[in-house]
Amino acid sequence: MEPIRTIESRTVVIPRENIDTDQIIPGRFLKVTDKKGLGKALFSDWRYDAGGGPRADFVLNGPAAEGCTVLVAGDNFGCGSSREHAPWALVDYGIRAVVSTRVADIFRNNALKNGLLPIVLDPASHAKLLAAPGASVRIDLASQTISLPDGSTASFPLDGFAKYCLMNGVDELGFLLSQEESIAAFETRSKV
């Protein structure tokens, strides 16, 4: 997992509310266990027509979305069924952070375990981002802040352990394995 300290990017905005995991990646793509290539299936039913051609009216198909690593979405992003493929698809596409006013709990946990930063903002700060598609933002994970189009910044909550893992590019298992010597020393000192 690639460490996240700061993210500087233009935003891509999908203002829809209640974007569920089946919309993020439809169920027909869930038969794979390899994360690579899932970015092609991201928002597949919105991005492509019945013949597989790109829909010109979907934001990710336009030149303005090229290179954007911050997705700003409507309220309640990632709701619906639990599928780890949803953050896999976002990360494989190149998204590093998702910004909303609410992120579903299971999606948030899956995102954090896969190097995707879910940011929950207050409605006023979020509205500034929704109103400015393509705005340049800077996310500073250490201070837990994101710059807004008007030059102000907004803070966002994040669990300390999740923050540590993201900043160091490790998942929970990777962290545990990095503590192997300390665990062995503790077990030696604390024999039962």
Curated annotation (Swiss-Prot):
Q: Which gene encodes it?
A: leuD
Q: In which pathway does it act?
A: Amino-acid biosynthesis; L-leucine biosynthesis; L-leucine from 3-methyl-2-oxobutanoate: step 2/4
Q: What does this protein do?
A: Catalyzes the isomerization between 2-isopropylmalate and 3-isopropylmalate, via the formation of 2-isopropylmaleate.
Q: Which GO terms describe its cellular component?
A: 3-isopropylmalate dehydratase complex
Q: Which reaction does it catalyse?
A: (2R,3S)-3-isopropylmalate = (2S)-2-isopropylmalate
Report the CDD domains cross-referenced here: IPMI_Swivel
State the family named in the UniProt similarity comment for this chain: Belongs to the LeuD family. LeuD type 1 subfamily.
Query: Which E.C. number(s) belong to this protein?
Result: 4.2.1.33
Q: Which cysteines are joined by disulfide bonds?
A: none
Assembly, per entry? Heterodimer of LeuC and LeuD.
| Species the sequence originates in | Anaeromyxobacter sp. (strain Fw109-5)
Q: Which NCBIfam families match?
A: leuD, PRK01641.1
The lineage's top-level taxon is Bacteria
Name assigned to this protein:
3-isopropylmalate dehydratase small subunit
Q: Which SUPFAM superfamilies match?
A: LeuD/IlvD-like
Q: Name one GO biological process term.
A: L-leucine biosynthetic process
Q: Which InterPro entries match?
A: 3-IsopropMal_deHydase_ssu (IPR004431), Aconitase/3IPM_dehydase_swvl (IPR015928), AconitaseA/IPMdHydase_ssu_swvl (IPR000573), IPMI_Swivel (IPR033940), LeuD (IPR050075)
- Gene Ontology molecular function terms on file: 3-isopropylmalate dehydratase activity
Does Amino-acid biosynthesis show up as a keyword for this record?
yes
Keywords attached to this entry: Amino-acid biosynthesis, Branched-chain amino acid biosynthesis, Leucine biosynthesis, Lyase
